């Protein structure tokens, strides 16, 4: 990402490529990575080694580059700077790696920005839990002390529980950890140096959180909040409902303004 000419675009592409790896859409995964020594049936999948996983991820990223984008608001996203960001993670593995890189990029883009990486409290299919996210992030820190480790230590990135245990996301029933963080940041530090209201971004990752349960939530947020729905369409049901094709990508930025 750091060596890319467009680091935000690279972070978004990696996030979308990672979102393919979903136990709830295993057939879609197999269709993309069939060239690897991939094993399993249509209900489960596994990789024999790290080389297989790397091959599969590159195949997925190529698919992102070559696929149609049902919504492409990347330019609008790039034109904004966000002071506070909540990233609601989806799947464990490659997907949460993509979300971590996106959180890192968003924390770097705006001076004084803070980002919350949010995960389920309890397990649901292969969705990452807060305990798994913390373990994963600790490994990432070892490889990136300049940013990920420093950002965790100085509070630019926080790891928080959503208080939920579902593949969907009910934004009216989030837990104490994320609620307290948002309340604190939006009141104590809720204005910038010029006294203007801080600008917030809510990132909803994956089919369950962004396509199935919160597709229109941008209409209902406060005026200083934007919502980014970010996902790869991996099922015929969702494709038909949205007027899309399987493997189409969604990068939809919305608000109530």
Positions of PLM-derived features:
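Gly/Ser/Thr-rich loops at beta-strand to alpha-helix junctions
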Residues: 88-100, 121-125, 207-212
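Structural motif
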Residues: 84-86, 200-201
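Electropositive, gly/pro-rich neighborhoods at or near active sites that engage anionic ligands
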Residues: 1-82, 96
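Histidine-anchored nucleotide/phosphate-binding helix
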Residues: 93-112, 116
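Residues at the starts of beta-strands that form the adenosine-phosphate
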Residues: 83-84, 112-116, 226
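C-terminal functional extensions of proteins
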Residues: 119-121, 128-257
């Amino acid at each position: 990402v750091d060596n890319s000419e467009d680091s935000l675009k690279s972070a978004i592409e990696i996030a979308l490529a990672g979102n393919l790896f979903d136990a709830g859409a295993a057939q879609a995964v197999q269709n993309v990575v069939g060239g690897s020594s991939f094993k399993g049936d249509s209900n489960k999948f596994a990789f024999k080694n790290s080389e297989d996983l790397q091959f599969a991820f590159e195949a997925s990223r190529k698919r992102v580059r070559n696929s149609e984008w049902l919504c492409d608001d990347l330019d609008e996203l790039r034109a904004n700077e966000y002071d506070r960001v909540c990233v609601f993670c989806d799947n464990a593995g490659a997907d949460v790696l993509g979300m971590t890189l996106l959180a890192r990029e968003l924390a770097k883009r705006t001076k004084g920005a803070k980002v919350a990486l949010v995960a389920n409290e309890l397990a649901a299919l292969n969705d990452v839990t807060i305990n798994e996210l913390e373990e994963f992030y600790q490994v990432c820190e070892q490889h990136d002390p300049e940013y990920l480790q420093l950002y965790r230590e100085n509070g630019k990135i926080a790891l928080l529980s959503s208080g939920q245990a579902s593949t969907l996301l009910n934004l009216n029933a989030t837990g104490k950890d994320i609620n307290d963080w948002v309340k604190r940041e939006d009141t104590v530090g809720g204005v910038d140096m010029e006294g203007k209201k801080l600008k917030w971004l809510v990132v909803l990752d994956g089919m369950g959180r962004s396509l199935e349960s919160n597709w229109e939530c941008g209409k209902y947020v406060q005026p200083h909040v934007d919502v980014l729905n970010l996902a790869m369409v991996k099922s015929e049901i969702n494709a038909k409902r949205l007027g899309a094709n399987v493997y189409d990508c969604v990068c939809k930025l919305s608000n109530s303004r």
